[in-house]
Amino acid sequence: MQGSSLVSVFTLLCLSLPVSAHQDHQGGIKAEQGNAKLAPFDIIHTKISSEGNTALFHMAVSAKAGSSKPTATGELAGSHVFSYVWPTSIDSYSVGFERNVGILALAVTSHPDFDDTPLFDENGDGDLKNDGAVWHSHWVVLQPNERCGEGVLGVVDIPEGASPRLPSTWPGLPILLDSPGWDPTFNDEVVEVRVPFADIGAVETASFDGVTAGLRVHQSVHAPLLCVVDVMDVSSGDLSLPGRVNR
């Protein structure tokens, strides 16, 4: 009798495992698997949902998320950034920038050659200036920039002498980038970020996509400074932002 019960329990567990895994990827954008060179950046699912006044940014990939980082070069110019990115239709004004100045995206990044979160000590060693390799979050504003390449996106530069509206946690770089300190979490193939909003309605009406990409820092500050140079994967395949929050 006991053996029969154990078999029944085991059978139920086996049947429930695929269902649970499938439920993890309900809604959002389901992406084609196996079309990225690096499995930790091969997107299989992207989703944004809201819980009260908090937005949950979710991305699942086909291998352990966050397990691959750029190789340090020892120099800022020419150094690389790896990123998990959620481009959205959210107005850039909602997070502290001017209104509608480009594509507002949440990005989780790693870059061992520089630190751009001067308010935070991600590795807990007491030094605020050596944490670039630790995965961390940014708001970035993106626009097509021909100086990055034909049809290529770059982080929007701040022209010399300009004083645009900027978030209070702007790190001082001459680009539309914020370092708000929302810690990403990694759990096997999933990376997530929880972001509080004063007006969650700005998120709940938004559309979104998912991108994994490499960026490169240029030698000249306004060359532009930071360009997308390697799009590893796009959830929709065409950056059409088909995702809808809470769907």
Name the predicted role of every residue range.
Residues 1-7:
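Bacterial N-terminal signal peptides that target proteins for export
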Residues 16-18:
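N-terminal signal peptide c-region/cleavage motif recognized by signal peptidases
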Residues 25-36:
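Intrinsically disordered, low-complexity eukaryotic regions enriched in glycine, serine
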Residues 38-143:
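Surface-exposed, glycine/proline- and aromatic-rich loop segments on solvent-exposed faces
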Residues 88-92, 205-247:
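Acidic/polar low-complexity flexible segments
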Residues 143-196:
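Short helix-loop boundary/capping segments
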